[in-house]
Structures are given as structure tokens and as C-alpha cells.
Regions:
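A structural boundary/capping signal
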Residues: 1-198
């Protein structure tokens, strides 16, 4: 699942905002983070996993959404992003909160930072066709925006340290970092575009 998403070009919405269902992602061959999460949810439902997504709220309003699942070994995720550190995690986290916290360091850039998270079962949408609709599925986005999120509190001093490190790295490189992040052994494989640098 993660390999398939990694192979898709990221949907930068060059021709206007989209929120495509799995059918739309397959038809267009591209996906942004929420489209990838919805696609993963549809596919993994066929393997008897509930369609759960984890929504991050960021201090700069650039939120992120990933598909999450629980295996015998713990909680893991499947994700697509423009940032190398915000892709999938292996199923080794004891709780959804621990999984969410694993994204803390790699979420920090010039302005970003996690402030809250929520796990949402998309079956609450009832008969709304978020899986295979041929049109945009904006109701999913509205659901996530309105859903109560649990706060994640981190040391402001630590946040500023990480932000300074990120800014210093980007001043020297035209690409985004990932090799200096802790816990990379718990990440799933990155898309090829990131592997040779960072």
C-alpha cells in the first residue's frame, strides 16, 4: 500500500483544489495527503481493517491526514506528503497518541508544528460516498475540520531548537531534511524522490 502511494506523484493541485476519492486518485494517478489517506482506507477495508484516519492540526494551519491501523505489533500508518518525514510508520506504537507524537520532530519546518490530533472512523459518514465518488468529497474535509482534536503539548524550547536546525539546513540545501530525524528505523520506505538526499 505504501509503495503504491510512494510511486504516485504528489497532487499539488496546480489546476485548483481537489479532494478525490480512491476512484479519482486511480483515474488521475496523483494524490495529496488526504486523498492518499482515503485511498489507503478504501484498500485496507478490503483487508478487514476499519477506515481510520488520523488528522493533525498544525500551528500554521497546514494540517496533515494519514491512514492509521492497528496490527498485533501496534499502531502504524500509511501516508503521502510533500515532506519526507511525514510518510508512513511501521506498526510498532502502543497507542494512536504515541504514533501521532512520532511525527512531532519531522513536522517542524519554517512555520509548522503539531498542536493536536484526532483519530476518526470514516464510517461515521454513513451512506456518503467518499470511497468511489466521481466528484470531490469535500464532506470528508469538513468532518475532519469540525472533529474535536486532542492537544499535544511539546516544549517550546525544543520546538525552537528544531526550527532553528531546520532553517539552518534549508539555508544550505535546496531540499528538505530527513536523515537527521530520530526514530527513522520505525518509518516505512520513503518515495524514491527523497532517498538519495536529505
Amino acid at each position: 500500500m505504501q509503495r503504491w502511494l510512494n510511486a504516485l506523484p504528489y497532487n499539488n493541485e496546480a489546476h485548483g483544489e481537489t479532494l478525490r476519492s480512491f476512484r479519482g486518485v486511480v483515474a488521475h494517478g496523483t494524490a495529496h495527503c488526504l486523498e492518499a489517506a482515503l485511498s489507503a482506507a478504501v484498500i485496507m477495508e478490503q483487508h478487514h481493517l476499519p477506515p481510520l484516519v488520523l488528522s493533525f492540526e498544525s500551528v500554521d494551519l497546514l494540517d496533515h491526514v494519514i491512514f492509521v491501523y492497528r496490527a498485533a505489533s501496534g499502531w502504524g500508518s500509511v501516508a503521502r506528503s510533500r515532506d519526507p518525514g511525514l510518510h508512513g510508520r511501521r506498526p510498532c506504537y502502543a497507542t494512536p497518541r504515541a504514533l501521532a507524537q512520532s511525527y512531532f520532530e519531522s513536522y517542524i519546518d519554517h512555520t509548522g508544528g503539531i498542536k493536536a490530533y484526532a483519530v476518526v472512523d470514516l464510517r461515521v459518514l454513513g451512506r456518503y460516498d467518499w470511497r468511489l465518488a466521481s466528484t470531490n468529497v469535500w464532506k470528508v474535509e469538513r468532518l475532519l475540520l469540525d472533529w474535536p482534536h486532542r492537544p499535544l503539548v511539546f516544549s517550546e524550547r525544543r520546538v525552537e531548537q528544531l526550527r532553528r536546525r531546520y532553517v539552518a539546513f534549508r539555508q544550505q540545501h535546496e531540499y528538505k531534511p530527513w536523515r537527521y530525524y530520530k526514530g527513522r528505523e520505525r518509518w516505512t520506505a520513503l518515495p524514491a524522490e527523497y532517498r538519495k538526499r536529505g
